[in-house]
Amino acid sequence: MPSSPPPSRPGPSARLIELDGLRGLAAAVVVIHHCLLTVPTFARVGAWPGVVPADPAARILTQTPLHLLWAGHEAVLIFFVLSGTALVYPVARRHAQGRRFDWVDYAPRRIVRLWLPAAASTALAVTLMVLVPRSADALLGPWMTQAHPAGLSARHLLLELALQPRYAYRNTVLWSLHAEAVFSFLLPLVVLVVALAARTRAWWLPAAACLAVPAVTGDTRTLVYVPVFVLGATAGWRWGHLDAIAPERPAPWATPAALACLVLVTIGWWPGLQGPVAGRLAAAVSLAAVAALVVLAVRAGALRALLRSRAVQYLGALSFSLYLVHEPVIVAIRLLTASWSPWLVAPLAVAVTAPLTWLFHRYVEAPSHRLSRRAGRWVSSRVRRAAR
């Protein structure tokens, strides 16, 4: 009787292209979010539940699932789950193949990958501040005046370049890169936790613990969003040990389930769900919906035609550059058109941001990515030589 073949190991790491599609769509939502914040009515609503606009149309866009169209903070939660998955997935693939992950290569690579584009986006924001001075005119709304004060203190600029969140006001999106940096430094510890959980066949336990955090605190910002990243890390470790990750054909129920998750992402904004108990439950449900959306897209093929479409994939490829350049442009356009209707900001912002995003990707992000790989290889080779 022939012996059974040895269990196969996962092959080379395949890119999870659904993640790119989700990242691109999330970046587009953030752009819409910031465009709407130039409208004083929506600026008073802000990024977190609590303020109910008096205008009926604004209330519909705020307190119904239509809020998904400009759910900026929830879109960033998707970014964080995707980052956790993307960073842990290659580590898991190497582990499944019996190969070591080069942490010495990872550290400088990650530093260059994050900090160079962030520094370039800060330089862009400062340049636009000099060319288009910021204003304290209350008619512009609280987002334009309070989140974008004037001033170019060298001390604050240095702190901002270090990705300290309190000083990232020249380009407000940099607060999220502070969270990315924190998680990047904690990645070895996170990998250890999810790996130990998986070894005891309780791979789901870190995810369950992370979902419990907003249920207790009522806030997904707890611990610099590390629990949100860990949700993605748990999925990345699990998927990295599978032979087949994405199904050949989408499950028939996958897209309806994903659409239900998209609706639930906005649950924290629905009427009557801002109280102490209801708010905690809504925060947990919203985060669970974000995580489930990512799982459904990858493992069940939800929204596959959309996420794999050429336009959405292209948007995903440029999403980091779009994220880093759009906000200073929107602020500058609103200042230049202060006497115009703020509703004109969106089309003007798209017209200016689209080519600027391409240029930033071509001359900043892509070279930074290549440099990060060279830096990682160089440091790793030097450390190996010194260890001999």
Model-identified regions with their sequence ranges:
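Hydrophobic, membrane-inserted alpha-helices
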Residues: F183-V191, L205-P214, A260-L262, I330
